[in-house]
Design a protein with these regions (language model features):
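Primarily membrane-embedded glycan-assembly and transfer machineries that use lipid-linked glycans
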Residues: 1-170, 174-175, 198-312, 319-321, ...
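Transmembrane helices and adjacent periplasmic/lumenal helix-loop junctions
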Residues: 180-198, 300-307
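Short, surface-exposed, polar/charged, turn-prone segments marking secondary-structure boundaries
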Residues: 120, 126, 187, 326-327
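Noncatalytic linker/hinge segments flanking ATPase motor cores
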Residues: 181-182, 260, 339-343
Length: 411
């Protein structure tokens, strides 16, 4: 990395983190100082399981709310409950942290999630070089990742597990890949966009990768048996918790645009189209399939900015393959430019946001809206890019994807 690039990246990191600190100080991640709301329910749910209590119970929910708000949500009129909304096995990877006090566990979680995020960049690229270091630095300069680290959002854990499974499958380590894949389903909306193309690839090359599918099924049954033994009837309680959770979070982008009934129908069609596309492109590069899957899932699942770390997958694919797009391929070049403008714009927006925070109420409002707006712009450009590559692929790019796919098949 050149010195000038290193200086720019360092400035970008500093500006983005300062902006995020201003933002979190204004909105306050929790009403009670020292408590990060996103991580506490998972930690407390794990603790409840060790104490042989029901993590979905009203008592545990109220403990989460008192930790976050200083009182129950009902007592202060807050509609946002702090329920345990994970499947039971989501607690397994972090179970040792529940033996520690929350402050210590939270500190460990911060560094664990940061390491997993950095490793995910290298795992996606399949190599460790200066470009990977640059990608890592820019990843830690993105607001969604910064927020996830600030709040210890478990999405980073399950994203890291899913990408780790992806890398192991690509490297031919099928049984460890299956184990990590099952553990990553502790947050299904994060795991499924990665697991679907992995399963498609495994079924398409059944003789080479059948051990992955068999191991995935076997370990899933083992985990299911353990969860039922730990908490009988947990599925019913989990579904009830999810139903309550969906009442106060944002709907998917498709539902937001088209309304509940039409949006749900379109989402179903998009999901079926995704499965069909993955199968039709089953001989394509696995990272390309995962990138396409991620952008479609981002349209059809409830939209949360902190899940935008998933967009790292299509961004890495796009940047690593940008050189294959011919200069005269104006359509693809324009889409690539739009994606890069959205990326650079998100970092510039953070710098602008720092200034706006210290101006008028209108300035603060604009600064407040910047992170979500830039993520949507990036998502929009990625959706267009991936759809165009599926429908009207660049010839050089298509040839490279097929070659890369055959190369991976031989490893």
């Amino acid at each position: 990395m050149k010195s000038r690039t290193a200086i720019l990246v360092a400035l970008c990191l500093a500006a983005c983190w300062y902006y995020a600190i201003c933002y979190s100080s204004a909105v306050r991640l929790g009403l009670k100082p020292g408590v990060v709301v996103d991580f506490y329910p998972l930690w407390n749910g794990s603790r409840a399981i060790l104490q042989r209590r029901d993590p979905y119970s009203l008592r545990v929910t109220e403990e989460n709310e008192v930790a976050a708000y200083g009182a129950t949500a009902k007592a202060i009129g807050n509609p946002v409950e702090q329920r345990f909304v994970y499947p039971i096995h989501a607690t397994f990877p972090l179970m040792p942290l529940s033996l520690l006090d929350f402050r210590t566990a939270s500190g460990i979680a911060f560094w664990l999630f940061a390491v997993l995020t950095a490793l995910s960049v290298g795992w996606l690229r399949g190599r460790w070089d200066r470009t990977t270091v640059l990608y890592c630095a820019l990843t830690f300069s993105s607001y969604p990742v910064i927020y996830d680290l600030q709040s210890r959002q478990p999405v980073l854990l399950f994203f890291g597990l899913a990408v780790g499974s992806f890398a192991l499958l690509r490297a031919g380590h099928l049984i460890p890949a299956a184990i990590l894949a099952v553990l990553s389903t502790g947050k299904p909306q994060i795991a499924l966009p990665v697991l679907l193309p992995m399963l498609t690839c495994a079924f398409a090359r059944w003789h080479e990768r059948k051990r992955f599918v068999i191991s995935l099924g076997t370990f899933s049954l083992v985990i299911l048996s353990v969860t039922i033994a730990v908490s009988p009837g947990w599925m019913r309680e989990w579904i009830a918790a999810l139903h309550a959770y969906l009442q106060y979070i944002r709907p998917s982008l498709i539902v937001s645009i088209f309304g509940s009934q039409v949006g749900t129908a379109i989402s179903g069609i998009l999901f079926l189209a995704l499965i069909a596309t993955l199968w039709l492109h089953r001989e394509s590069n696995l990272l390309f399939q995962a990138a396409f899957s991620v952008v479609i899932f981002h349209l059809i699942v409830p939209y949360q900015t902190y899940n935008a770390v998933m967009l790292l997958i299509p961004v890495v694919w796009a940047e690593d393959n940008a050189y294959l797009i011919p200069v005269r391929d104006w359509g693809n070049q324009l889409i690539l430019v739009a994606m890069r403008v959205a990326l650079v714009g998100s970092w510039i927006a953070n710098a602008v946001g720092i200034i706006l925070w210290h101006t008028s109420p209108l300035g603060k409002l604009i600064a407040w809206l910047l992170p979500g707006t830039m993520v949507r712009m990036l998502l929009g450009s990625l959706v267009v890019m991936m759809v165009v590559q599926v429908v009207f692929p660049s010839k050089r790019l298509a040839a490279n994807l097929a070659t890369a796919s055959r190369t991976v098949a031989l490893t």
